[in-house]
């Protein structure tokens, strides 16, 4: 992590010396002359219901926001911004406060701002004008509070590369997702079904205002996607033709400039493709700046594929002799079979483990339906059902997902998880009904009779303890950083809240190591090593500490 931060700040310093390369991008704005730029009038019906003509924004009883917008790119952008106004400003505050927490130094923040301006200098050249225009429309409703980072439009454009930049800074753990698809003999009725967890984690507050967005553009197909205020890119979505997209990060090198953000590429596929071949053709047109697996499902083809993209090459991973497809955070196609970074990802990360766990759970279920798919997404155990501890990234359900989502493309049905994570009720939407002509009532679009109940885990003592653990885990991090005294009672309580998670013993071991209580450190490091440790580097780190401790005890 440290080396990547130093690398980025070195680039930031370099960018001060060559800032002339950023002047065009700093002042660039999309061409909106062909559009009507009149700002929409919004009527506030209640504190959680807003309308503007045919467009609406409301919060349903499960806590999900539902957005319906139609029009040309500028109309969609302006109306989205106007309807989501207060949430949009709150979301940017949450995101940028996280950056401040991560980089408290004012000098380093300044360097990061310089880096972002330099790094994103070519971003606008790689985003189609229709999406630049939409982003411009939304940006008119953002706060001026963060103009020191960049002006409204440029800042909003930068945020669409947040997934990609978080991915490049992999150690930030912003990204790590699991997805699967089943069809023919593997699904009920033989029709395609897909499901995924989107583990893009900033903090709990960031995921509070999930939006199920339903967009009817003048050009392209109507579609839905799960998003957050200010985000027009697609991370999970399905269009009216029954084509779905979801994205999973893979191992990537740090490129020297931004290209097309993955979420913009997938938005283009979602809006303009109805078959797998059309999705592939769109992907071939764009240059990306990180490595990503795009799972594309198609009702017309009744199957799913992976479009694997990187800054240098692209591959299509098909499974011609199978009726299921699994994806975590590594590439599977021939083009990347000998790729050094991909092989390292498989060997050292938790990606392969989650892949095998999905294989295991799918093999236990002869035919997948939405309820079974939700159970797989919510699964917290490891291979052969071993306890991993709650929050372990080896689990499919890491208890940090922004959302879980399930698609049945032929039926045009989609299920979106309400908070928290993927544990809340999976709310069902029927795109036939949403985009139908009879939209006279201002009410939730959900098909209530098809909803999937919330996870019973929410009512358990274990879940309540996990919530307490998150608080105590943050506390122990602060105490360790400040090298303050931690009471035996605190450590005992901390470990009891999540006893199967290796982290609670590792951090206790670190404390005792700091205090030169080497026997206690040894016992805790040894206990951690008996549990399922998330990654190979994590395990090696503990083993290194244990060697040091044993030498101290000799």
Can you say where each PLM-predicted feature lies in the sequence?
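Internal mixed beta-strand/loop scaffold within catalytic domains of large alpha/beta enzymes
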Residues: 155-265, 402, 406, 414-416
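Assembly/interface hotspot detector across virion components, adhesins/toxins, and nucleic-acid enzymes
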Residues: 3-9, 55-57, 307
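Short, surface-exposed beta-strand-loop junctions and turns on beta-sheet-rich folds
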Residues: 200-202, 252-253, 312-314, 420-424
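Histidine- and/or cysteine-centered catalytic micro-motif in compact active-site loops
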Residues: 250, 299, 310
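C-terminus-biased signal that marks the final domain/tail of proteins
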Residues: 21-168, 270-293, 299-304, 326-554
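Extended amphipathic alpha-helical segments with heptad-repeat/coiled-coil character used for oligomerization
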Residues: 307-323
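Bacterial Sec-dependent N-terminal signal peptides
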Residues: 1-28
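Short beta-strand-to-turn element immediately C-terminal to the catalytic PLP-Schiff-base lysine
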Residues: 182-183, 297, 307
């Amino acid at each position: 992590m440290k080396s990547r931060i130093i690398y980025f700040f070195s680039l930031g310093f370099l960018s001060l010396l060559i800032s002339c390369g950023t002047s065009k991008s700093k002042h660039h704005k999309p061409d909106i002359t062909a559009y009507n730029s009149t700002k929409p009038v919004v009527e506030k019906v209640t504190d959680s219901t807003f309308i503007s003509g045919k467009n609406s924004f409301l919060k349903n009883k499960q806590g999900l926001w539902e957005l319906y917008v139609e029009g040309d790119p500028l109309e969609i952008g302006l109306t989205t911004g106007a309807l989501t106004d207060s949430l949009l400003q709150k979301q940017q505050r949450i995101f940028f406060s996280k950056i401040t927490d991560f980089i408290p130094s004012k000098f380093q923040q300044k360097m990061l701002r310089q880096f972002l301006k330099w790094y994103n200098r070519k971003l606008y050249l790689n985003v189609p004008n229709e999406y630049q225009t939409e982003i411009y429309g939304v940006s008119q409703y953002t706060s001026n509070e963060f103009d020191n980072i960049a002006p409204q439009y440029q800042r909003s454009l930068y945020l669409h590369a947040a997934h990609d930049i978080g991915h490049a800074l992999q150690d930030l753990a912003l990204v790590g997702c699991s997805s699967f698809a089943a069809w023919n003999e593997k699904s009920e009725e033989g029709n395609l079904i897909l499901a995924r967890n989107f583990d893009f984690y900033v903090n709990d507050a960031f995921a509070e205002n999930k939006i199920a967005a339903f967009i009817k553009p003048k050009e392209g197909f109507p579609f839905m996607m799960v998003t957050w205020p200010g985000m027009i890119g697609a991370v999970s979505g399905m269009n009216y033709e029954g084509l779905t997209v979801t994205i999973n990060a893979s191992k990537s090198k740090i490129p020297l400039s931004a290209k097309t953000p993955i979420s913009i590429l997938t938005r283009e596929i979602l809006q303009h493709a109805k078959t797998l071949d059309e999705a592939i053709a769109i992907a071939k047109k764009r240059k990306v700046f990180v490595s990503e697996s795009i799972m594309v499902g198609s009702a017309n083809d009744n199957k799913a594929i992976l479009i694997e993209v990187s800054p240098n090459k692209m591959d299509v991973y098909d499974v011609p002799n199978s009726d299921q497809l699994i994806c975590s955070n590594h590439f599977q196609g021939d083009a990347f079979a000998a790729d050094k970074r991909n092989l390292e990802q498989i060997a050292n990360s938790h990606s392969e483990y989650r892949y095998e766990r999905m294989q295991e759970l799918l093999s236990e279920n002869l035919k997948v339906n939405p309820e079974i798919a939700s159970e797989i997404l919510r699964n917290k155990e490891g291979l052969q059902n071993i306890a991993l501890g709650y929050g372990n990234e080896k689990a499919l359900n890491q208890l940090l997902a922004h959302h879980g989502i399930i698609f049945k493309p032929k039926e045009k049905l989609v299920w979106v998880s309400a908070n928290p994570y993927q544990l809340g009720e999976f709310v069902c939407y029927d795109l036939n009904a949403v985009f139908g002509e009879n939209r006279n009532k201002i009410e939730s679009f959900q098909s209530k009779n098809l909803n999937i109940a919330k996870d019973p885990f929410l009512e358990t003592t274990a879940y309540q303890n996990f919530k307490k653990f998150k608080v105590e885990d943050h506390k122990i991090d602060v105490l360790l950083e400040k090298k303050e005294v931690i009471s035996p009672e605190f450590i005992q309580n901390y470990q009891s809240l999540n006893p199967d998670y290796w982290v609670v013993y590792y951090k206790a071991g670190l404390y005792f190591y700091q205090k030169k209580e080497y026997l206690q450190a040894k016992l805790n490091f040894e206990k951690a090593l008996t549990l399922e440790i998330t990654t190979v580097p994590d395990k090696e780190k503990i083993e290194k500490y244990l060697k040091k401790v044993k030498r101290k005890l000799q």
